[in-house]
Amino acid sequence: MNKNCLICHRKAAGQHYGVLSCFACKMFFHRMVVENLHYCCQKFNKCYEKFIILPKCKACRYQKCLEMGMQAFPRRVKSFEESMDLKIQRMLMNLSEMDEQRHWRMLNSYSIEDPSLGDVLVDSNVMKIMRKPSNQKVTAHEWAFLDVYSRISHFSNFEFMNNISFADRKLIFSFNCLRTGVFHGSMRTLREQRDCLLTPSGEDVYPDAVHNLFKDSPGLLNRTCCLLVSKLIELKVTNEEYQLLSLIFFCNPTISHNLSDFARNTLASHQIKYSSALFRHLQITNPGTAPVRFQELISLVHVINRVTNDMQHVSMMFQCMIPSFKFKQLVTDTFVDCGVVQKKSNVKILNEKPCADSSQDFIFHKNKFIH
């Protein structure tokens, strides 16, 4: 480079702090800024005006740097809170992308096979999946089957599930598939700006035979299709809140006394992780009301459990009254019979709110589930 430094007129080495300058002037400016140095000129701050010999006045040299346009661009160290927020942001983006892919595969897939929950957990490729023909009519029961399969595939992609035993995973999925399906279906209904649950293709979730069976108590069917949706509408639940809540509810460590200690501890640690992320997200989006909002969102589990219990009752009554109808085995294992694992499961946070530690993430100190 044949150009001269704009500060001292010696040979320039490049652009430093926004100004063509030499290394000496670069390091001088750097020290002045980093060490917060201050000097005074004894000659009226005019040492760098028409000089022949390079002046030794540091005050005027620094003033010349500023006049030529040097600006400090200090490297900003992210605070703990900022680093945590970025992690949560990336987590939410990843969860949303995974859920969108799951939903797309469910909408565009079809299968006539009939594996059990155990079959799918042993070999995820046991079921032959084909691309759904555009003219393929899908019944409500088939949608339930495809939804269950998509959820097993979806949650199996989480790394923490890989280390859990087959027996524990079977308990976890048999308990959670219907509940997560009800939650997602109601959230989908909210996004579609409707107030009553329908299948993805827009049909009634119950066939005429079920309506005839419950013609004297239509309120039960209406409750299963509308109660959770109305609550989501009331709370204006966002997609980010939904993504985290799904995992908080899925990672329930007390769904069964038959769960191993390892599985229970794994679920509990991840429930804390996603609960912490949700609370921090609410602190950003709902400053001042995050604790109240958090409790409102967590209380959705009671509505989900009530709707789930009602759906199980409808399914079992339908099976008893019309025994000739054959449920897909995957639906039976996770829908009709899932109540066998645990008939009642109500979530309650024991008088504790997430608390902030100056050096740790927001966590639950007592995050327990009571039956």
UniProtKB/Swiss-Prot annotation:
<keyword id="KW-0479">Metal-binding</keyword>
<dbReference type="InterPro" id="IPR001628">
    <property type="entry name" value="Znf_hrmn_rcpt"/>
</dbReference>
<keyword id="KW-0862">Zinc</keyword>
<protein>
    <recommendedName>
        <fullName>Nuclear hormone receptor family member nhr-51</fullName>
    </recommendedName>
</protein>
<feature type="DNA-binding region" description="Nuclear receptor">
    <location>
        <begin position="2"/>
        <end position="77"/>
    </location>
</feature>
<keyword id="KW-0675">Receptor</keyword>
<dbReference type="Pfam" id="PF00105">
    <property type="entry name" value="zf-C4"/>
</dbReference>
<dbReference type="InterPro" id="IPR035500">
    <property type="entry name" value="NHR-like_dom_sf"/>
</dbReference>
<dbReference type="GO" id="GO:0008270">
    <property type="term" value="F:zinc ion binding"/>
</dbReference>
<feature type="zinc finger region" description="NR C4-type">
    <location>
        <begin position="41"/>
        <end position="60"/>
    </location>
</feature>
<dbReference type="Pfam" id="PF00104">
    <property type="entry name" value="Hormone_recep"/>
</dbReference>
<dbReference type="InterPro" id="IPR013088">
    <property type="entry name" value="Znf_NHR/GATA"/>
</dbReference>
<dbReference type="GO" id="GO:0005634">
    <property type="term" value="C:nucleus"/>
</dbReference>
<keyword id="KW-0805">Transcription regulation</keyword>
<dbReference type="InterPro" id="IPR000536">
    <property type="entry name" value="Nucl_hrmn_rcpt_lig-bd"/>
</dbReference>
<dbReference type="InterPro" id="IPR049636">
    <property type="entry name" value="HNF4-like_DBD"/>
</dbReference>
<keyword id="KW-0539">Nucleus</keyword>
<keyword id="KW-0863">Zinc-finger</keyword>
<feature type="zinc finger region" description="NR C4-type">
    <location>
        <begin position="5"/>
        <end position="25"/>
    </location>
</feature>
<dbReference type="GO" id="GO:0000978">
    <property type="term" value="F:RNA polymerase II cis-regulatory region sequence-specific DNA binding"/>
</dbReference>
<comment type="similarity">
    <text>Belongs to the nuclear hormone receptor family.</text>
</comment>
<dbReference type="GO" id="GO:0003700">
    <property type="term" value="F:DNA-binding transcription factor activity"/>
</dbReference>
<feature type="domain" description="NR LBD">
    <location>
        <begin position="98"/>
        <end position="337"/>
    </location>
</feature>
<keyword id="KW-0238">DNA-binding</keyword>
<keyword id="KW-0804">Transcription</keyword>
<comment type="function">
    <text>Orphan nuclear receptor.</text>
</comment>
